[in-house]
Amino acid sequence: MSFDFETKISAKFMNEKAVVLNPKMQNILTERGFGELQNDALVLDSFETLYLLYNNKLELKKINKNIIFDELIQKYLQKDDDALTRFLLYRDLRTKGYVVKDGFGFGSDFRVYEKG
């Protein structure tokens, strides 16, 4: 999936998740199938966060310090040995134009939808 937005999204890293607080930036992402609205924030899954960082579309900060892709993937790998594999699968599906959401469990990592 190519990116049709020029704006770099700003997010805060809180509780191991990227959180987008700006409503305009939330709209940019939700229109493209990213994240889940929780109260007044858009929360991104780990694979969405990695994907946006990898494609240089996300500026992620924790206490005014930028977090880069390599740092974040290492953090996720400490808790989940399959984090890199999940990211690569997610990236492949998004690149092919699919909207990808977190799975429901029971051995399902993703839900995959055609865009539209």
Predicted regions and their residues:
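Long Lys/Arg-rich low-complexity intrinsically disordered regions in nucleic-acid-associated proteins
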Residues: 1-116
